Every structure is written in structure tokens, then in C-alpha cells.
């Protein structure tokens, strides 16, 4: 059976600061790169938004998906069950990024997705390319607004 592989990375220049993400989708000899930059955000938001963006870009949602991320925050939250606990308690205790986690959770209900951790800044060419995309997006002009973050950062 064919598997869709998604490599992701997020970056921020300062935490918070300008940030961006990079995504590579690969399936059956096809490859697509996606990136976007934001004027004020955090590295964790960009890591998670990269995963969400990759999943949202999938056309063949019936195929199994493996997402490779160098973010332990994202991989552990999903694979070790933290996210299910956060959802069950409505993010009590000040868990951050509720908007993105809720978006991921809703999206993941209709996709057979597994996350795998990869070491960042190492020898994985796809992760390294995602890092290039993310940092270039963060350094770009005309950065988008991470509206939820900017409205809620001081709460």
C-alpha cells in the first residue's frame, strides 16, 4: 500500500519572534514543498502548524501518512497521548496553542497518521530542506499574521 510521507520543520527568530514553517509532501514519486512566514509567533506554533499544513495538503486522505518532525513537543504530545488528555480537560492548566492542537485533532480524526521523531540539523536531507524552507519563510518579506497568537499572547 502506498504511504504519504510528510517532513516538517518550524522556526522562529526569537521566541516569540518572526517565524516560519517548511513542509515536504512525498507520495509515489511526487514531491511538493510548502512554506509560510509569520511576523510574530513561536517555534512550537510553527512546528505544529507545519504538521497541520502538511495534512491539510493531502488529497488522498484514505492513504496512510507518516509525518516526520524534529519537534519532541509535537511528536510526544500526539504519540504519547498528551493531546488526548488536553482535549479531555479542555486544555486546563494553561496548555498553550489550543487553537492549533484542536485543529490538528479534528483533522487527524479522518486520516491514518503516525508521527515519527527525526533528529534536527543532522543527516536527514528532507528535514534539512524543511529547515531551509522554514528559516527562509521567517526571514521573508510581507509576513502573515498569526492572529490567534497575537491576540492571546499576553493571556
PLM features: residue spans?
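Short acidic DE-rich linear segments
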Residues: 149-155
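Metal-centered catalytic cores of metalloenzymes
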Residues: 146
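A short, polar/acidic, helix/strand-boundary loop motif
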Residues: 29-46
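Short, glycine/acidic-enriched capping/hinge loops at junctions between secondary-structure elements
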Residues: 17-19, 35
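Extreme N-terminal starter segment of soluble prokaryotic enzymes
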Residues: 1-5
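Short beta-strand scaffold segments in enzyme catalytic cores
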Residues: 20-27
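RNase H catalytic domain
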Residues: 8-15, 52-129, 133, 138, ...
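Short, conserved alpha-helix that lines the donor NDP-sugar binding/gating region
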Residues: 47, 51
Amino acid at each position: 500500500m502506498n504511504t504519504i510521507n510528510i517532513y516538517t520543520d518550524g522556526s522562529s527568530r526569537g521566541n516569540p519572534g518572526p517565524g516560519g514553517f517548511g513542509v515536504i509532501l512525498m507520495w509515489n514519486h511526487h514531491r511538493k514543498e510548502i512554506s509560510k512566514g509569520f511576523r510574530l509567533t513561536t517555534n512550537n506554533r510553527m512546528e505544529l502548524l507545519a504538521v497541520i499544513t502538511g495534512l491539510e495538503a493531502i488529497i488522498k486522505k484514505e492513504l496512510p501518512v507518516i509525518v516526520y518532525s524534529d519537534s519532541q513537543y509535537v511528536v510526544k504530545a500526539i504519540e504519547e497521548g498528551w493531546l488526548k488528555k488536553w482535549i479531555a480537560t479542555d486544555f486546563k492548566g494553561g496548555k498553550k496553542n489550543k487553537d492549533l492542537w484542536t485543529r490538528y485533532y479534528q483533522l487527524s480524526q479522518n486520516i491514518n497518521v503516525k508521527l515519527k521523531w527525526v533528529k534536527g540539523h543532522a543527516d536527514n536531507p528532507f528535514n534539512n530542506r524543511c529547515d531551509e524552507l522554514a528559516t527562509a519563510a521567517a526571514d521573508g518579506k510581507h509576513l502573515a499574521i498569526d492572529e490567534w497568537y497575537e491576540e492571546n499572547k499576553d493571556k
